[in-house]
Amino acid sequence: MGTLLCAPWQAGAGKWPTNALAHPALCFLGITTALCVIWALSVCRYDRRPRRLDREYAMTLQYQTIADCVGNTPLVRLQRMMGTTSNTILLKLEGNNPAGSVKDRPALSMITRAELRGQIVPGDTLIEATSGNTGIALAMAAAIKGYRMILIMPDNSSAERKAAMTAYGAELILVSKDEGMEGARDLADRMQAEGRGKVLDQFANGDNPEAHYTSTGPEIWQQTAGTVTHFVSSMGTTGTIMGTSRYLKEQNPDVQIVGLQPMEGASIPGIRRWPYEYLPKIYQSDRVDRIIDMGQTEAEETMRRLAREEGIFCGVSSGGSVAGALRIAREVENATLPAHGRRQERADSCR
């Protein structure tokens, strides 16, 4: 093609031939050039017009709001920390959720389902007792939906958690560290009785485990192609382990459900060893095959190892889950990583 186009010019010794229009190659070149100019002018005119998302285009967007980004988190394989074992531990990276933890799932579920049942309406004030990630997730969900959100938490909660909640527009009420989460829950109930708002109550709300039954469980089953043999999770409100275990057991009754709780006297953010009278009402002991008592030191060290050896920056509760999976590595095949650490840890805990 290059030779054809250049030949007439060379033949004319530097002069364009008088019969150029009769040459097929030159006619093609001229038509192509004209079309390119027309196209360029039309593009320039279009670019000068103000751009807007019309209704038809907006309907093709994959995510209409940030709420649509909750769930469908990746499952990755633990590598360097596995040592010589031939077993596989898989980590569910819930930190990929918009507000940074697995709690995004139940937070959005509790508000959305309450709306569908008419239990809350625009203009209502929502109240919740929280120790961290649930509060952050609820603050995000309330911001999306336009609700006023009041969160009650112990005053020894980290500054990072408080800052994240207020950044989403939530109002904080602090109780003393001696009152703890039990005191926060009692205050939430009193405020609701006084008509100051409506308590979502993550500890007794069936929409909490339902969120995991309809999303976390199916995701793990699909991502492992049904080969999961164990599910390991830390226990706080117990919503994650209750909902996920229900789904996995329906698919395969032989899947082993392993829960993590702090050992006596230990304090692990995001995991609780509840007094009997405050045990979450959504908790059903027959859904858990084994409970491991976890120490704070082991959970924190595993958290640091995940960052340094696997490149996974997570929280202490997640470190506890992985520590539990590693502890039973000779029998476990898959574990879940239920939280991401950026929004729950003090900087000095990662040193």
Task: List the predicted regions and their residue ranges.
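Extreme N-terminal basic, low-complexity initiation segments
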Residues: 1-11, 21
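PLP-dependent amino-acid enzyme catalytic core
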Residues: 23, 28, 32-351
